[in-house]
C-alpha cells in the first residue's frame, strides 16, 4: 500500500530526527571514550610509577578501579561501534501497538536500540517488543516482557529500506511475512558479528 504524502513526510521527519540523534550520540560518545581512555592511561601510568610508595592494598584497589573503568569503557565502545553501523540506516521496521488500556505506541525496530530522553526511538530487533513485528500481522498480538505477558492490538506493520539516511522504500504489510529485503538486512548484519 502506498503512503500518502503526509505519511511520507512524517516518516522522513522521523528518520531525520533519529539520524540527528544517532549522530549526536556518536559525537558525544566518541569524545567521552577518548577522554576516558586518556584518563585511564594516565591513571595506570601514575599507579605504576608510584608503586614503590603505596602499599599492596592501595595498589590492589587502584588496579581494581582501573579494571572497572576499562570494562565500563569497553561497553561504551561496543555501543559506539553499533551506532556507527546504523548511522545511515537506523531501522527497518515498525509496528503500531496499543497495549490493552493504553495509548498507541509506535515501535521502530533496528539492529540496536537508540534512546532519547529516557525513551526508545529505535528498539533492538532482539528485544521482547520487537517480536510483535516478526510474529504477528495486523490484529490481536502479545509479547513476553520481564513483567509478564503484554496483550494488545497491532494497527500498522511497516517495513523500510533506508540507504544513506534516505527512505528508498516504505510499505505497509499486514501479514506476518518476512520479505526478501528484511532477510537481506538481517543476514548481512548477523554475518558481521
Predicted regions, residues:
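Extended, charged low-complexity regulatory segments
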Residues: 1-192
Amino acid at each position: 500500500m502506498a503512503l500518502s504524502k503526509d505519511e511520507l513526510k512524517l516518516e522522513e521527519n522521523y528518520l531525520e530526527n533519529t539520524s540527528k540523534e544517532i549522530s549526536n550520540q556518536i559525537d558525544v560518545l566518541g569524545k567521552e571514550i577518548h577522554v576516558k581512555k586518556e584518563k585511564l592511561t594516565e591513571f595506570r601510568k601514575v599507579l605504576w610509577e608510584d608503586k614503590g610508595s603505596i602499599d599492596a592494598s592501595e595498589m590492589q584497589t587502584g588496579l581494581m578501579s582501573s579494571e572497572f573503568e576499562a570494562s565500563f569503557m569497553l561497553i561504551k565502545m561496543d555501543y559506539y561501534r553499533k551506532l556507527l553501523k546504523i548511522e545511515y540506516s537506523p531501522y527497518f521496521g515498525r509496528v503500531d501497538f496499543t497495549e490493552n488500556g493504553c495509548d498507541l505506541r509506535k515501535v521502530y525496530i533496528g539492529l540496536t536500540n537508540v534512546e532519547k530522553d529516557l525513551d526508545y526511538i529505535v528498539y533492538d530487533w532482539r528485544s521482547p517488543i520487537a517480536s510483535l513485528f516478526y510474529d504477528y500481522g495486523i490484529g490481536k498480538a502479545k509479547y513476553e516482557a520481564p513483567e509478564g505477558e503484554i496483550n494488545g492490538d497491532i494497527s500498522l506493520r511497516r517495513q523500510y529500506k533506508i540507504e544513506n539516511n534516505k527512505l528508498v522504500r516504505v510499505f505497509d504489510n499486514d501479514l506476518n511475512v518476512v520479505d526478501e529485503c528484511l532477510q537481506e538486512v538481517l543476514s548481512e548484519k548477523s554475518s558481521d558479528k
